[in-house]
């Protein structure tokens, strides 16, 4: 059983800075994002990971590399939410046409619905729980929030109540054999 699962959200991109939904578009890190990625490496110094899994998108892979991590494998299940018709739009832009829209409840036309994302997260959780030692997952804001919810056996929409900044570290673990969120958004 994985002793801890460290979640690393990729560092800043132009779209994340602007609040745009960035799903499958492969946006590079900003210069500031690269600096944050390097500083993540300082925070991870001395940590030993039995497995490091990354989203295949360059912003996640570059963040991992800058942080001194070597991706053991790329997982499509760690890709960001597929925003379909809403790719590149901000939430206010979407709500101008669809008042009250909430990603975690409503999903996205032409993209993923919450049960689709939950299924991806459940596959990742099953994989990492089988690993002996510490695991690192380097991916994206919404998928990591959803993954944290599924780790504690909560509905995927709980992720909509968790804020996760770019270039942050969160830790999933166990307390008395119960899955917990040990640290969040640090």
Which sequence ranges carry the predicted segments?
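Acidic, low-complexity terminal tails and accessory targeting/binding regions
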Residues: 1-3, 47, 82-92, 149-186
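Generic beta-sheet signal
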Residues: 5, 131-142
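Loop-to-helix element that buttresses phosphate recognition and phosphoryl-transfer chemistry
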Residues: 5-63, 109-122
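Short, well-ordered beta-to-alpha junction loops that form the rim of enzyme active sites
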Residues: 11, 55-57, 77, 121, ...
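Phosphate-coordination/substrate-recognition cap region in phosphate-metabolizing enzymes
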Residues: 39-102
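Glycine-rich phosphate-binding loop signature in dinucleotide/nucleotide-binding domains
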Residues: 45-48, 128-133
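Short glycine/proline- and acidic residue-enriched helix-loop micro-motifs
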Residues: 96-116
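GST superfamily/GST-like fold recognition
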Residues: 141-145, 175
């Amino acid at each position: 059983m994985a002793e801890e699962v460290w979640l690393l959200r990729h560092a800043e991109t132009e779209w994340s800075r602007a609040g745009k939904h960035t799903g499958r578009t492969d946006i590079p890190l900003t210069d500031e994002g690269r600096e944050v990625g390097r500083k993540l490496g300082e925070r991870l110094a001395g940590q030993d990971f039995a497995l490091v899994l990354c989203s295949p998108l360059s912003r996640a892979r570059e963040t991992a590399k800058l942080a001194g991590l070597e991706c053991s494998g790329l997982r499509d299940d760690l890709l960001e939410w597929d925003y379909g018709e809403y790719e590149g739009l901000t939430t206010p832009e979407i709500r101008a046409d669809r008042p009250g829209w909430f990603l975690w409840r409503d999903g996205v036309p032409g993209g993923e619905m919450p049960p689709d994302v939950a299924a991806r997260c459940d596959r990742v959780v099953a994989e990492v729980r089988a690993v002996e030692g510490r695991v690192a997952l380097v991916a994206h804001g919404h998928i990591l929030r959803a993954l944290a919810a599924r780790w504690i056996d909560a509905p995927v929409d709980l992720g909509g109540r968790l804020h996760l900044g770019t270039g942050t570290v969160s830790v999933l673990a166990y307390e008395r054999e119960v899955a917990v969120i040990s640290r969040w958004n640090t």
